[in-house]
Amino acid sequence: MPRYVVQQHFRDAEDWHFDLMLERGEALVTFSSGVPPDRTEGLPCLVRHLGDHRLAYLEQEGEISRGRGWCRIHDRGTFEWLLPPGGEGIGQADEIRVRLAGQAARGTYRLVRESKTGADYWRLRKVTEKA
């Protein structure tokens, strides 16, 4: 199973965000958000797709190089790529679905590309599972 991590990044007390990083091959597909996925009262929310990050970020905590602040791990676990299968073709996809199995975030999450805001912005929401 691929791994994921949610890091909380801080530059100072007023400048912080969360990064959701999803393992795909030798890199982490990364989205920046104002709320972590486990805080469902903050969802849906707009997230920004960042460049891929190194796998080392799965374990990264503490100071970030080049004076970019510091980070702590908010959540981690494994996940399953539901759409697109295996995470292949994300660059062309308009929708991504993953099933997270972490310490805090559990369940299916959907990211839908926001056509009005440009290719880098997506809407993140938790999918309600039918019983």
Language model segments and positions:
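A charge-rich, low-complexity, intrinsically flexible signal that marks solvent-exposed coils, linkers
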Residues: 1-131
